[in-house]
Swiss-Prot record:
It comes from Thermothielavioides terrestris (strain ATCC 38088 / NRRL 8126). The lineage of its organism: Eukaryota, Fungi, Dikarya, Ascomycota, Pezizomycotina. This is AA9 family lytic polysaccharide monooxygenase B. Has a modular structure: an endo-beta-1,4-glucanase catalytic module at the N-terminus, a linker rich in serines and threonines, and a C-terminal carbohydrate-binding module (CBM). The genes for catalytic modules and CBMs seem to have evolved separately and have been linked by gene fusion. One of its GO terms (biological process) is cellulose catabolic process. O2 binds at residues 178, 187. Pfam families: AA9, CBM_1. Lytic polysaccharide monooxygenase (LPMO) that depolymerizes crystalline and amorphous polysaccharides via the oxidation of scissile alpha- or beta-(1-4)-glycosidic bonds, yielding C1 and C4 oxidation products. Catalysis by LPMOs requires the reduction of the active-site copper from Cu(II) to Cu(I) by a reducing agent and H(2)O(2) or O(2) as a cosubstrate. Shows no activity on wheat arabinoxylan, konjac glucomannan, acetylated spruce galactoglucomannan, or cellopentaose.
Length: 326
């Protein structure tokens, strides 16, 4: 019995680790920019301490030297998958019953490449929770993460039309609540994208800070979703008036439904001469450029830089999908 229990626990832990995920790609008005302007975390593991600076943009992130160009009022589509570099729809975007809300914030910064996330953030999107009349517990209800899984990891986010132009960080986040019944159990999966927004707006939305916007005891963070639920209090501020929401349980639309890797338009960003970031476009990498420490250097379908900066080595982190300079 003891050996069975240990084996069962080991299997559960393995399943838990396999279900971790990362926001790792971006579409802009249906054009695939891949992972060129995302700060990829060092792993697909979650942040659990809401008081840590890691709650801003995750742990050990690389900072690309490029920024994705976005017009105010356009739609970007964030994309999440369990394994780095794997954009297949064969697996859930975030598995293991990791149910919870999906939220997106933006932060106006002087330079999206160097910004550390300490400036204020405003929420521009959320897809949280809706009651399933046929269900008995929160597990049965509709959640933002279930919508992610239904849409191959994709979720459409409107960039507010009235915000002032300039550089922004866009922070995409999932809060997984499957073990959130005890303090510190909620799991936060986030990535920050580096954007340059163009337009003629002048709005400067009110902001919150990370850390600070969340408390470990917030009712939407400290919660038992395995019991019947009649309501859910979404963490953080309300969505900015120029942003958008999606009703949990609704169908895929726009790029969520139609954008397919390799079968539509894609874009390659021009790298500075001191390239430190790999690109996902054909001909944009290989041995002729250098990837900075913690950046991708190989994996299935990868065509970017394969040589790592001095002091780091290209290591298979999640073979065959993803190799990283470590």
């Amino acid at each position: 019995m003891k050996s069975f229990t240990i084996a069962a626990l080991a299997a559960l832990w393995a399943q838990e680790a396999a279900a971790h995920a990362t926001f790792q790609d971006l579409w802009i008005d249906g054009v695939d920019y891949g992972s060129q302007c995302v700060r990829l975390p060092a792993s697909n593991s979650p942040v659990t301490n809401v008081a840590s600076d890691d709650i801003r943009c995750n742990v050990g992130t690389s900072r690309p030297t490029v920024k994705c160009p976005v017009k105010a009022g356009s739609t970007v589509t964030i994309e999440m998958h369990q394994q780095p570099g794997d954009r297949s729809c064969a697996n859930e975007a975030i598995g293991g019953d990791h149910y919870g809300p999906v939220m997106v914030y933006m932060s106006k910064v002087d330079d999206a490449v160097t910004a550390d996330g300490s400036s204020g953030w405003f929420k521009v999107f959320q897809d949280s929770w809706a009651k399933n009349p046929s269900g008995s517990t929160g597990d049965d209800d509709y959640w933002g993460t279930k919508d992610l899984n239904s849409c191959c990891g994709k979720m459409n986010v409107k960039i507010p039309e009235d915000i002032e132009p300039g550089d922004y960080l866009l922070r995409a986040e999932v809060i997984a609540l499957h073990v959130a019944a005890s303090s510190g159990g909620a799991q936060f999966y986030m990535s920050c994208y580096q954007l340059t927004v163009t337009g003629s707006g002048s709005a400067t939305p009110s902001t919150v800070n990370f850390p600070g916007a969340y408390s470990a005891s917030d009712p939407g963070i400290l919660i038992n979703i395995h019991a019947p639920m009649s309501t859910y209090v979404v963490p953080g501020p309300t969505v900015y008036a120029g942003g958008s929401t999606k009703s949990a349980g609704s169908s895929c639309s726009g790029c969520e439904a139609t954008c397919t890797v390799g079968s539509g338009p894609s874009a390659t960003l021009t790298q500075p001469t001191s390239t430190a970031t790999a690109t996902s476009a054909p001909g944009g990498g290989g041995s002729g450029c250098t990837a900075a420490k913690y950046q991708q250097c190989g994996g299935t379908g990868y065509t970017g830089c394969t040589t790592c900066a001095s002091g780091s080595t290209c290591s298979a982190v999640s073979p065959p999908y993803y190799s990283q300079c470590l």
